[in-house]
């Protein structure tokens, strides 16, 4: 581990020199590449430097204790030594996490798809609740949300809603939201006060660059038709809605929220690229699944990941056994505690795997 950290520190110093070199600064593209590489390893190098400083302070304190000291001063040094050793352990644990391989998609924007599952209109209302929850969380994080396509219902829910979230590190925090979300509550239409259970499925796809997914135009069938609103009525007379079918995989994407056919086609292609990239990623992960099954979950769309119980004001994440009795706050976008716990568990699982392979 420390050989790797020494190499990273050397690389960091070299990059620091390069980004200050007038010759490099003159070549904008090259300079930006070095700045990005420098920023990527800055945190780990700073933590490593603090670790080395702490180790030196421990050695100094131990040397002092070998000398003849008056009792009060000896006690002070021993107390400081104890704190320094605790700090060393904390920094070492942090370095191990920082050395874990980064998910190449972590810094990407995402395309999220929420679909109402079992439960009819109640499931559609729950899909709407989830969309608002994620929108509010994105707002707290300073991210931007844009609806790509939606199929609203008369009561204000969604049969399906597809939207993008753009900002710093979106995928790294949203990737564990994929799966089946379950709601337990008394519907407003229920006169007997019985609790109903409904579900909605969430898919989180990292946005795919055009260069990452090659699509042969001959593999596409593109249909245009009139857009329809809630209840199925046609909302305009022009054929602005677009349906794209990717023939080799059978993936179908429909976009109708924009008035322009060109914009709907552009959005549909963006969703198609993300779905194709996600399909390739899922196939790759299925091959690795026998070697490693993460406790946080497989990201399998059919995996029930979380229950939202309204009568008890409770939300439970089944993957990590976390229960919070503040569902109202969670639905207002207060998701950090759940997301942080999922990230911590995933890191612990990956560390265990690294230690097991060591």
UniProtKB/Swiss-Prot annotation:
The molecular function terms in GO held by this entry are: translation release factor activity, codon specific
Q: Which SMART domains match?
A: PCRF
Locate the transmembrane regions by residue number.
none
Residues modified to N5-methylglutamine: 233
What's one Pfam family the UniProt record gives for this protein?
RF-1
Give UniProt keywords alphabetically.
Answer: Cytoplasm, Methylation, Protein biosynthesis
Q: Where, per UniProt, does this protein localize?
A: Cytoplasm
Entry-linked Gene3D superfamilies: 3.30.160.20, 3.30.70.1660, 6.10.140.1950
Q: Report the superkingdom from the record.
A: Bacteria
Q: Which InterPro entries match?
A: PCRF, Pep_chain_release_fac_I, Pep_chain_release_fac_I_sf, Prokaryotic/Mito_RF, RF-1
Principal location class: cytoplasm
Q: How is it modified after translation?
A: Methylated by PrmC. Methylation increases the termination efficiency of RF1.
The answer, when asked if Ligase is one of the entry's keywords, is no
Q: Name one GO cellular component term.
A: cytoplasm
Region annotation (Disordered) maps to: 286-309
Family assignment from sequence similarity:
Belongs to the prokaryotic/mitochondrial release factor family.
The entry's function note states: Peptide chain release factor 1 directs the termination of translation in response to the peptide chain termination codons UAG and UAA.
What is the name of the protein in this document? Peptide chain release factor 1
The gene name on file is prfA
């Amino acid at each position: 581990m420390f050989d790797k950290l020494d190499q990273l520190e050397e690389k960091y110093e070299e990059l620091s020199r390069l980004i200050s070199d007038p010759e490099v600064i003159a070549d904008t593209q090259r300079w930006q590449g070095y700045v990005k590489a420098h920023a990527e390893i800055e945190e780990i190098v700073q933590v490593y430097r603090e670790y080395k400083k702490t180790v030196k302070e421990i050695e100094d304190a131990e040397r002092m204790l070998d000398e003849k000291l008056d009792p009060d001063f000896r006690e002070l040094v021993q107390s400081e030594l104890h704190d320094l050793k605790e700090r060393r352990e904390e920094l070492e644990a942090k370095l191990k996490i920082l050395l874990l391989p980064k998910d190449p998609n972590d810094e990407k924007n995402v395309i999220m798809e929420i679909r109402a599952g079992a439960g009819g209109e109640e499931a559609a209302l729950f899909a709407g609740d989830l969309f608002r929850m994620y929108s509010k969380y994105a707002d707290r994080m300073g991210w931007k949300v844009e609806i790509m396509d939606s199929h609203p219902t008369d009561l204000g829910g969604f049969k399906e809603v597809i939207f993008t979230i753009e900002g710093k590190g979106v995928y790294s925090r949203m990737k564990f939201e994929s799966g089946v979300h379950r709601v337990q509550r008394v519907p407003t239409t229920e006169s007997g006060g019985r609790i109903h259970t409904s579900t909605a499925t969430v898919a989180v796809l990292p946005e795919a660059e055009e260069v990452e997914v090659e699509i042969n135009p001959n593999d596409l069938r593109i249909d245009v038709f009139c857009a329809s609103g809630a209840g199925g009525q046609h909302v305009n007379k022009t054929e602005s809605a677009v349906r794209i079918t990717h023939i080799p995989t059978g993936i179908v994407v429909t976009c109708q929220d924009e008035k322009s056919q060109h914009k709907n086609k552009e959005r549909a292609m963006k969703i198609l690229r993300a779905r194709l990239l996600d399909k390739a990623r899922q196939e790759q992960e299925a091959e690795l699944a026998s070697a490693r099954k993460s406790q946080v979950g497989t990201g399998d769309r059919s995996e029930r990941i979380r229950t939202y119980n309204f009568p008890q004001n409770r939300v439970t994440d089944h993957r990590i056994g976390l229960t919070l009795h503040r569902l109202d706050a969670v639905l207002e976008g207060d998701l950090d505690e759940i997301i942080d716990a999922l990230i911590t568990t995933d890191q612990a699982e990956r560390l265990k795997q690294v230690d097991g392979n060591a």
